[in-house]
Swiss-Prot record:
Pfam families: TPR_1 (PF00515), TPR_8 (PF13181). It comes from the Eukaryota. The keyword Transferase does not apply. This is Photosystem I assembly protein Ycf3. It comes from Porphyra purpurea (Red seaweed). Essential for the assembly of the photosystem I (PSI) complex. May act as a chaperone-like factor to guide the assembly of the PSI subunits. The lineage of its organism: Eukaryota, Rhodophyta, Bangiophyceae, Bangiales, Bangiaceae. GO terms for biological process: photosynthesis. The gene is ycf3. Disulfide bonds: none annotated.
Length: 173
């Protein structure tokens, strides 16, 4: 089961060693350890662009992982892969599933907004103004939520919200 990791840099090597130590010393069940191992292997495959392998590992981790918080990150990473492959509808589904389990995932909120913004741009190019407005408004809604959770992040989104007049109800604005 364990994926052979290249660990070309110090941080990756350190993470792998620490993760292995934590797995050995924490009082966790066999299933929890196995789920984490699949998750770690999924992250490794994903970082190397091996998306099919990453998805296999994430799906195995989902079968075993019971903790909602941990499941939210697995779902988020699955969404990342689908978004990277241009499968935006599937990506949105997984981001939303992750948010149902953990509403404090600003990166998922941001990525949902990015997809809606992209769809808004596509609608403009197709001269579908009504759809573009709807998509841009949805993007604004999700960016506002992300910014509320992580006010120092998403500067480009904050600038876009300001320049388009969509900055609303965010503390300090």
């Amino acid at each position: 089961m364990p994926r052979s990791q290249k660990n070309d840099n110090f941080i990756d090597k350190t993470f792998t060693v620490l993760a292995d130590i934590v797995l050995k010393i924490l009082p966790t069940s066999k299933e929890e350890k196995e789920a984490f191992s699949y998750y770690r292997d999924g992250m490794s495959a994903q970082s190397e662009g091996e998306y099919a392998e990453a998805l296999e590992n994430y799906y195995e981790a989902l079968k075993l992982e019971e903790d909602p918080y941990d499941r939210s990150y697995i779902l988020y990473n699955i969404g990342l892969i689908y978004a990277s492959n241009g499968e935006y509808i599937k990506a949105l589904e997984y981001y939303h599933q992750g948010l149902e389990l953990n509403f404090k995932l600003p990166q998922a909120l941001n990525n949902i907004a990015v997809i809606y913004h992209y769809q808004g741009v596509q609608a403009v190019e197709e001269k579908n103004i009504e759809l573009s407005k709807l998509m841009f408004d949805k993007a604004a809604q999700y960016w506002q939520q992300a910014i509320k959770l992580a006010p120092d992040n998403y500067i480009e989104a904050q600038n876009w919200l300001k320049t388009t007049g969509r900055m609303k109800n965010i503390q300090g604005y």
